[in-house]
Amino acid sequence: MTSARKNSEISINTEVYGALELIKNKILSNFSALMDDEQIKEVAKKGYFNGEPMPYSFGFAPFGEINQNIASKLHAGQRVNLNMDGKIVGHIDVAKVFKFDESMRAKNIFLANESNSEMSLNLGKYGISGEFELYDESLQISKDALNELIKESGAKKITAVFLTADPFNRAHERLVRMTIDKADLVVVFLIRTREERHIDYEIRKQVLDFFNQNYLPTKKVFVFALKNTTLFSSHANPTLECIAASRLGANKLVIGQNHSGIGMFFDHNEVHTILDIYKNDLNLDVIVLPELVYCNKCKTLVSTKSCPHGQHHQIKYHPDVIKELLFNGIMPPAILVRPEISALILSKLYINRFKDIQKLCDDLFVNSGLLENKTDRDFYEELMKLYQTSSLT
């Protein structure tokens, strides 16, 4: 790495890094390099590249005066480092430096979130094409682990689901279970959220892993973490979801009826979406599920299509409402979030919340008579059990 310091450096942020990570690990295409101006034009014109559907080109024109000053002076054959937060995270072997065509920005992977962002995203005047490397191989390791599981299990019916799981609630549970029933393997892509008030990604990952390990059949669900990019956030780019799912072996993608961006329309009384072209190109079946709610008449979780009782009897799984409870230290009702999951989240949000958790648990809960060390998480789980005791209500 010492010699790498002698190279010129381009500064990037996490979002750019996340897009580069997807490109390098062939999550979006079999093509894994930065495109030149001619390749960018081909993608913009055709929507395909090397026979693959490609809604966005991989044109990289680093923004910022310092970055552009460096980019303008680069030449073919030169290596330039990628610097993120003061650390060299990769490098580009420059094949070509070119002037970036502004008319191509709408179809650029690094600007794909622009219409869904409050801030204007930017590219510079000079673009850089060429092969590149990233030194963190965690995404490749996850991809290899998934491929190994597919090979080991012999899974043929593979279904993908994209979730922010912010937070993971009972509706998510039902969605995953319904998906498992008709698949050999379910790949849950855990994606980032752009919500300002959100549960930390690592906590959400722990929750999904906990649920997978304790409440689902072994090796039926694989959690694939996409933590460095918001390209899939808010489900604003469903075409990318289709491509990523297919690239990682899925032949079915399950999305919600309220999935933003799918653009549902009717033709001859048949439901169509903008994803139809990708269904055919990728041999991917896209399933649109109705919204799941809790009905106080049915006394269970139902879909809005199967419940006859109307909205005035239906409790919806609003993420912001559930988060409001959690962020205020309140356990959501068990019909909204599994108590064990609420306990896990609260124990992470409020570390060492209680002055003497051991005494609190000993005085409040029954025990086996043996000395048992208690944690904040144990407290929340036991407390919910007391709330659910109905003999005196």
Task: Locate each region found by the language model.
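Non-catalytic terminal extensions that flank enzyme cores
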Residues: 1-236, 242-251, 255-393
